[in-house]
């Protein structure tokens, strides 16, 4: 191919666009003013030879998106759709040469997962090539004609370009027209009435199949259908200075969230103990001596235990332990396959420690979830359906362990065996990010009432509509759908779809003279067609879902009358019957289910106020979530601390790992700790009217002196009193979009990390999910160790300062039903105590959330250290500047500039917990 490419000529017009885009991917700017490198020229020639003009434009857009966000994972996922043949995939090695060297390792890891290896099976090749009739004698024609307008065709389909696969026949009803004409399960539909189904979404395929009485299908006998997904976790690794590096040698890539092996097998498998690799360290901790370790990892993450921080002057430093060492054994107990909490307990249990460590010289930094499609042979589908018993007239359960569910004809839901616990855990995980404790308890109450048969699906949905009253909260319905009974699924989909259509109509402009309020929602890029579909995420992205709804509104009959259903977002490819079966629309009942018991309200607002014990922090979520409303890339789960009031129904807090990937281990006597209140905010609350005023009263900016004694936080001392506050005014702020497949009105405001030292690993925001903050393993709080552990002492600083605050608000909220709090505004002063602010916001003017709302608080950032900001807060003002009328980007810029300015070492946020749209 190189010889072929060398002889190609490059037009000047296309060279400018593609060449500059490729140069941009390599980090260059102003490519038109300098000569292109040989690698860029070779890539451009290959693009000209292998891709059409529209494909080259998509490729250019893909590179521009990567250059703007530096998200390697999304770059590779997007290329999966574009480079749809082995010949086109030859562009990947050329592209690798023009991306920054620091991203090449991650690029290699993602492509090594098998996503873009040349197809080796007879099934993969026709997925995109067969639409042109390239199948070796396997393509055949199937003609279907409806006798009546509403007669069903008798088959269901699965797949779509948003899942990276073609359109496949997943079910054929016995005795149906499709069966009589020879359509079989496992057939791939290539064309419908001369319309190609290559690279079409699932919704587009459904519309093409339902748009005509007579169908001539070109099908390919693939003999299989796409099933669920296998989730692989890829870790990025850094050296002790925080620079990206390659993984340790002989470290296998995990093919799941855990690696459960016997310790002796794991030892031999990882080849960790080679000659001269390990050393023994004998530690005897005297009185007042600090162990001073920060550890990371655990068996629940498929990792060993690594040292990520060593305090200056500690016993660990004196014994030669350093950042980048892996702990293999402690007092005879292997650390190769030990849970994180067990490692913490063992390191705290004795003052005489004999450690076996290995100098690995690198650390796991961030984990990204990569999903691989699992295929189900059509023969297995037939056997499992024949051997299963189901409801009369409905299709039955499929005998496979693939996680997730898919939808059968006439609204029947084919539930897979491992769905129940997993979907409940996913729902609970997403609810922690979007809802307060009271709201989460309210939702679980209604779900429990529905599952127990106390209320109908209509009553439950109407109650959830009242509770999930913002766009982000509404996205939880995609997870709620997974626990709906099969017989209620059609009704649930119809109600949700009608609500979404009503919401969109309400937001439409009154006339053509008004700007398009959907411009940022309907903005389409290549990355939007590859929604996240891991085992702990949902399939469709917000943009895809809204575009589909808009398309249905413009091109189909009145959906409110026909009762057509939406495709739920699941972690397996959904089936949709292509039959035009009309479901009569039923009037919604006017009854409302009773509210949940009020005692749950006493647990409200204790999430941030509850003192935490070192070593018992929350685990990092397995992956970021993609919803119909918004995509979150939260670094940590927010589960209630011990002592929080239980929620009704079975709690899934124990379903996920309860141990963090980092821990703080301390031998310190609690009575000897000094109160550390450096990062506590100064809070002053006052009631406001039904709609909060954005203008802040002048006295809020200068709180009275007696405020600290009234139960609020003490004012932070001057930076000179605490060594860890030195240099707090040196910040560089970056505002970036979370993920290219998320809604464009979600920005993360954070600062670039400052200079890193060898003793502590700084947290970087990578293309994958950033793991949680490091915490310390120490034997005593000393001033010397405090100066070397800025992030490690964050939990200790909040321990004593959070015993008292928020009790008045907790008692006040106990008298109100969950989710119905009286609006109050709060002034929160956030000290610039870290290199990052660490919050992500959604909303802004001209959106469903008119004022910015906090959706993520990153651990280790200034907002987290403050302890008073929390997820769900609506930001009214920043340093006295109102955010009313500010669009999302403008609001994000205001927050970023407030953090960047050197005029003050804090930011004043006026926030509210008001639960309705302002």
Curated annotation (Swiss-Prot):
The keyword Phosphoprotein applies. Residues 141-224, 280-362, 827-910 form the PDZ domain. Disruption phenotype: Mutant mice for isoform 1 appear viable and comparable to their wild-type littermates in growth characteristics, reproductive performance and general health. At 2 and 9 months of age, knockouts show a profound hearing loss across all cochlear frequencies. At 28 to 33 months, they show signs for retinal degeneration such as a thinner photoreceptor nuclear layer and outer segments shortened. Gene3D superfamilies: 1.20.1160.20, 2.30.42.10. InterPro entries: PDZ (IPR001478), PDZ_sf (IPR036034), USH2_Complex_Protein (IPR051844), Whirlin_HN-like_dom1 (IPR047056), Whirlin_HN-like_dom2 (IPR033028). It is found in: Cytoplasm; Cell projection, Stereocilium; Cell projection, Growth cone; Photoreceptor inner segment. CDD domains: HN_L-whirlin_R1_like, HN_L-whirlin_R2_like, PDZ1_FL-whirlin, PDZ2_FL-whirlin, PDZ3_FL-whirlin-like. Keywords: Cell projection, Cytoplasm, Deafness, Hearing, Phosphoprotein, Repeat, Synapse. Residues 800-811 have a biased composition (Basic and acidic residues). It comes from the Eukaryota. Residues 591-600, 638-649 have a biased composition (Pro residues). Residues 240-266, 387-407, 503-538, 560-824 are annotated as: Disordered. GO terms for cellular component: actin filament; ciliary basal body; cilium; cytosol; growth cone; neuron projection; periciliary membrane compartment; photoreceptor connecting cilium. Residues 563-572, 654-672, 754-773, 783-798 have a biased composition (Polar residues). The modification Phosphoserine is found at residue 696. Residues 522-538 have a biased composition (Low complexity). GO terms for molecular function: identical protein binding. Involved in hearing and vision as member of the USH2 complex. Necessary for elongation and maintenance of inner and outer hair cell stereocilia in the organ of Corti in the inner ear. Involved in the maintenance of the hair bundle ankle region, which connects stereocilia in cochlear hair cells of the inner ear. In retina photoreceptors, required for the maintenance of periciliary membrane complex that seems to play a role in regulating intracellular protein transport. PANTHER family: PDZ DOMAIN CONTAINING WHIRLIN AND HARMONIN-RELATED, WHIRLIN. Forms homooligomers. Interacts (via C-terminal PDZ domain) with MYO15A; this interaction is necessary for localization of WHRN to stereocilia tips. Interacts (via C-terminal PDZ domain) with MPP1/p55. Interacts with LRRC4C/NGL1. Interacts with MYO7A. Interacts with RPGR. Interacts with EPS8. Interacts with CASK. Interacts with CIB2. Component of USH2 complex, composed of ADGRV1, PDZD7, USH2A and WHRN. Interacts (via PDZ domains) with PDZD7; the interaction is direct. Interacts (via N-terminal PDZ domain) with USH2A (via cytoplasmic region). Interacts with ADGRV1/MASS1 (via cytoplasmic region). It is linked to Defects in Whrn are the cause of the phenotype whirler (wi). Mutants are characterized by deafness due to malformation of the cochlear inner and outer hair cells and by circling behavior. Stereocilia are shorter and wider than in wild-type animals and there is a decrease in the number of actin filaments in inner and outer hair cells. The number of outer hair cell stereocilia is reduced with increased spacing between them. This is Whirlin. It comes from Mus musculus (Mouse). The gene is Whrn.
């Amino acid at each position: 191919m190189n010889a072929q490419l060398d002889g190609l000529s490059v037009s000047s017009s296309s060279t400018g666009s593609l060449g500059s885009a490729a140069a941009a991917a390599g980090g260059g700017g102003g490519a038109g003013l300098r000569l292109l490198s040989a690698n860029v020229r070779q890539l451009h020639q290959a693009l000209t030879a292998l891709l059409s003009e529209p494909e080259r434009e998509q490729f250019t857009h893909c590179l521009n998106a990567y250059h703007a966000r530096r998200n390697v994972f999304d770059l590779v996922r997007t290329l999966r759709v574009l480079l749809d043949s082995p010949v086109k995939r030859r562009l990947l090695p050329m592209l690798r040469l023009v991306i920054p060297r620091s991203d090449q390792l991650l690029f290699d890891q993602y492509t090594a997962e098998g996503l873009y290896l040349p197809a080796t099976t007879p099934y993969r090749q026709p997925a995109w090539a067969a639409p042109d009739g390239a199948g070796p004698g396997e393509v055949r024609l199937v003609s279907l004609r409806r006798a009546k307008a509403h007669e069903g065709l008798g088959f269901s389909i699965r797949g779509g370009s948003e899942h990276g696969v073609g359109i496949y026949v997943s079910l054929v009803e016995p005795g149906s027209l499709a069966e009589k004409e020879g359509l079989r399960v496992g057939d791939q539909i290539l064309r419908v009435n001369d319309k190609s189904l290559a690279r079409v979404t699932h919704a587009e395929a459904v519309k093409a199949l339902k748009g005509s009485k007579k169908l001539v299908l070109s099908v390919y006998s693939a003999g299989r259908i796409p099933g669920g997904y296998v989730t692989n976790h890829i870790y990025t690794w850094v050296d002790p200075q925080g620079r990206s590096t390659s993984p340790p040698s002989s470290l296998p890539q995990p093919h799941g969230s855990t690696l459960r092996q016997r310790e002796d097998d794991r030892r031999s498998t990882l080849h960790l103990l080679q000659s001269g690799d390990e050393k023994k360290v004998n530690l005897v901790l005297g009185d007042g001596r600090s162990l001073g370790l920060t550890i990371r990892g655990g068996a629940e993450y498929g990792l060993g235990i690594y040292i990520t921080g060593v305090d200056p002057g500690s016993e660990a430093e004196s014994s030669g332990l350093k950042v980048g060492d892996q702990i293999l054994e402690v007092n005879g107990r292997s650390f190769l396959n030990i849970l994180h909490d067990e490692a913490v307990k063992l390191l705290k249990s004795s003052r005489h420690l004999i450690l076996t460590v290995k100098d690995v010289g690198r650390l796991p930094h961030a984990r990204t979830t990569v999903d691989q499609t699992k295929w189900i042979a059509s023969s297995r589908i037939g056997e499992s359906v024949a051997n299963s018993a189901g409801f009369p007239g409905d299709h039955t359960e499929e005998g496979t362990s693939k996680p997730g569910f898919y939808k059968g004809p006439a609204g029947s839901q084919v539930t897979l065996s491992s769905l129940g616990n997993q979907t409940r855990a996913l729902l609970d995980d997403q609810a922690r990010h979007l809802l307060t404790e009271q709201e989460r308890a309210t939702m679980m109450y209604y779900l429990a009432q529905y599952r127990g048969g106390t209320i109908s699906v209509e009553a439950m949905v109407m109650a959830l509509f009242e509770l999930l009253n913002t766009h982000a909260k509404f996205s939880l319905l995609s997870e709620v759908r997974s626990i709906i009974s099969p017989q209620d699924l059609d009704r649930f989909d119809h109600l949700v779809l009608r609500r979404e259509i009503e919401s969109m109509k309400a937001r439409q402009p009154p006339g053509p003279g008004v700007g398009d309020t959907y411009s940022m929602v309907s903005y389409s890029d290549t990355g939007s067609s590859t929604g996240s579909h891991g085992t702990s995420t949902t399939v469709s992205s917000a943009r895809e879902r809204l575009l589909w709804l808009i398309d249905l509104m413009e091109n189909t009959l009145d959906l409110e009358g026909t009762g057509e259903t939406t495709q739920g977002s699941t972690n397996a490819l959904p089936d949709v019957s292509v039959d035009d079966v009309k479901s009569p629309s039923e009037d919604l009942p006017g009854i409302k289910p009773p509210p949940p018991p009020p005692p749950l309200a006493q647990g409200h607002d204790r999430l941030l106020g509850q003192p935490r014990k070192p070593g018992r922090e929350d685990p990092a979520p397995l992956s970021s979530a993609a919803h119909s409303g918004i995509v979150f890339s939260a670094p940590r789960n927010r589960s209630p601390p011990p002592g929080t009031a239980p929620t009704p129904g079975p709690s899934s807090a124990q379903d996920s790992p309860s141990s963090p990937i980092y821990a703080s281990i301390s031998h310190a006597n609690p009575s000897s700790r000094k109160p550390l209140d450096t990062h506590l905010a100064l809070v002053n609350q006052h009631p406001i009217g039904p709609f909060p005023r954005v203008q802040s009263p002048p006295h809020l900016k200068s709180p009275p002196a007696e405020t600290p004694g009234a139960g609020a936080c003490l004012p932070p001392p001057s930076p000179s009193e605490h060594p860890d506050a030195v240099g707090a005014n040196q910040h560089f702020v970056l505002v970036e979009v979370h993920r290219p497949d998320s809604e464009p009105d979600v920005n993360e405001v954070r600062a670039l990390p400052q200079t890193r030292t060898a003793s502590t690993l700084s947290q970087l925001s990578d293309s994958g999910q950033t793991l949680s903050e490091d915490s310390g393993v120490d034997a005593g709080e000393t001033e010397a160790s405090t100066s070397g552990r800025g992030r490690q002492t964050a939990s200790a600083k909040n321990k004593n300062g959070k015993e008292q605050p928020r009790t008045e608000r907790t008692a006040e909220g106990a008298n109100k039903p969950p989710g119905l709090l009286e609006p109050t505004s709060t002034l929160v002063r956030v000290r610039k105590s870290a290199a990052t602010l660490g919050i992500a916001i959604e909303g802004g003017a001209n959106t469903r959330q008119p004022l910015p709302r906090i959706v993520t608080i990153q651990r280790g950032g200034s907002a987290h250290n403050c302890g008073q900001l929390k997820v769900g807060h609506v930001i009214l003002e920043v340093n006295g500047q109102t955010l009313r009328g500010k669009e999302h980007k403008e609001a994000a810029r205001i927050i970023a500039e407030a953090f960047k300015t050197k005029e003050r070492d804090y930011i004043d946020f006026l926030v509210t917990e008001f639960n309705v749209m302002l």
